[in-house]
UniProtKB/Swiss-Prot annotation:
A single GO cellular-component term on record: plasma membrane
Protein name: Uncharacterized lipoprotein MPN_271
Major localization listed first in the record, in broad terms: membrane
Compartment list: Cell membrane
Protein's membrane topology: Lipid-anchor
Residues covalently joined to lipid (S-diacylglycerol cysteine): C26
Key words, A-Z: Cell membrane, Lipoprotein, Membrane, Palmitate, Signal
Domain of life: Bacteria
Entry similarity comment: Belongs to the MG439/MG440 family.
Annotated organism of origin: Mycoplasma pneumoniae (strain ATCC 29342 / M129 / Subtype 1)
Lipidation (N-palmitoyl cysteine): C26
Signal peptide coordinates: 1-25
Alphabetical list of InterPro entries matching this protein: Lipoprotein_3 (IPR001595)
High-level lineage: Bacteria, Bacillati, Mycoplasmatota, Mycoplasmoidales, Mycoplasmoidaceae
Amino acid sequence: MRKKKFLSRFSFSSLFLLCGTLLSACTGIQADLRNLIKETTGKDIDLSKAIKTKEGKKNIIASLKKSYEVNPKDTTKLLLDAWKQSFEEGKLGIADFDFDHVAYPQTNDPFTMERKVDHFQMTYQSFKDLLVEARLSYTFNWFGDYSSGDFTAKRGDKHYFYLFLKIKSDPKKQFSAKKFLTEGEAFTDQEGKQTTRNLEWIEFSASISWWTKGKDDVSQKSLKKFLESFATNTGYSSDINLFSYLEYLIK
């Protein structure tokens, strides 16, 4: 009984420390952002309130734009620290890696999918030479039997695969103060109608590539069955909204 109590107490303490660490990290980003804006613009913004309104978000982005013009080194570090921290917590900000629209074409296949960030490494001197290397792990949890061709899965089976990711700056679209976007953008919707889309974006144009690998032969078959067209991508350009990571951490 004593041993059981000790383990329960230890688990609770570990959970408390973990929550405290995450809270401290989020608070640290908020404090750094507030101080950076105050130092470079003279504004003292209540971020927790500002982040809840469109005007508040635009004010933060406009202030960060000024900060980047005055102090690009510290502003770059703040934005990339927020990206790294958010990504490690599972906020990827890149829809392609959710795979829901690929793995669930009919939404009736009897499995659920879990994703975890195993490794994330970011190196840079500036946005120009930024390099991100990461490894994500995915698990297919089967809650029913499935059979198609030479592929079968039974209830309770688990299939695992890894995604090895590389992100670099797109050399054709270099980051600059012009990437801090707050104005409306005109575009044509699917019905051909002209409309305006409000923007709260800090746009980083990235070159993204990845490849995937099943943990074992059965998992490799599962990967091929459901994600063959997405198993490897040698590189494409995508715009990543760096502001979404700050928004995630502040909220």
